[in-house]
Design a protein with these regions (language model features):
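Domain-terminus/edge residues, biased toward the C-terminal soluble/receptor-binding domains
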Residues: 1-209
Length: 209
């Protein structure tokens, strides 16, 4: 439950603006000043840490939910039931260190990436249309796994005009070794309308020559 709540909170950047503060000051209406210190020591002593919260009770003992972001990847470490305060921070630090050393966020594809190939168009104002990816894909992978990735594109032999930009015309399968791990739409990069009257007339003449 703590992990699920932490992951949801991490989606809201405003939270990290406050949770990442190590020291802050409150000025009361009376003018009295209260100094605040973040109980999450990792905010100060762990690079990239910007949340979340500590807690302790007699039953739960010392606990912490900590998060850090590096190289575009955010990790969350939840530690419960430690015998003393420092151990919860040590355990959380070890978990974060392991995660950042072992995994990486990889941008496999970006929306709008051109495929470098075209698809034949029947009875259109152009004979073919360029293709691009209709969506992007980022994944968390173990370090070194990128060499096992490949993308296979499945397309029909041709499509009929009219074709509109963004129209789905095929599928790109992302494979890790031989296992499909994701599917992306392949879309038309531009419009291919039906030929106009004059162009259509000349095409008919060409067919009869």
């Amino acid at each position: 439950d703590v992990m699920m709540l932490s992951c949801e909170v991490s989606r809201h950047p405003t939270y990290h603006t406050y949770a990442s503060k190590w020291l802050d000051t409150l000025v009361h209406p009376s003018g009295r000043v209260t100094d605040l210190t973040n109980t999450n020591r990792l905010v100060r002593f762990y690079d990239g840490c910007d949340g979340f919260k500590t807690g302790s009770t007699d039953a739960a003992k010392f606990c912490v939910s900590a998060t850090a972001q590096k190289n575009g990847m955010r990790l969350v470490a939840v530690v419960l039931g430690c015998e003393n305060s420092q151990r919860r921070f040590n355990e959380a630090r070890s978990m974060l260190d392991y995660g950042f050393a072992t995994y990486q966020r990889v941008e496999i594809a970006r929306k709008g990436d051109m495929l470098g190939e075209s698809l034949a168009v029947q009875r259109g104002s152009a004979d073919s249309v360029e293709l691009m990816l209709g969506s992007g894909l980022s994944m968390l992978l173990r370090t070194g796994q990128t060499s096992d990735l490949r993308i296979e594109v499945s397309l029909p032999e041709s499509i009929d005009a009219p074709v509109t930009a963004g129209q789905i015309v095929g599928i790109a399968r992302v494979l890790m070794k031989d296992q499909v791990i994701a599917k992306l739409n392949v879309v038309a990069a531009g419009d291919v309308p039906l030929p106009g009257f004059i162009e259509g007339f000349y095409r008919i003449l060409d067919m009869w020559r």
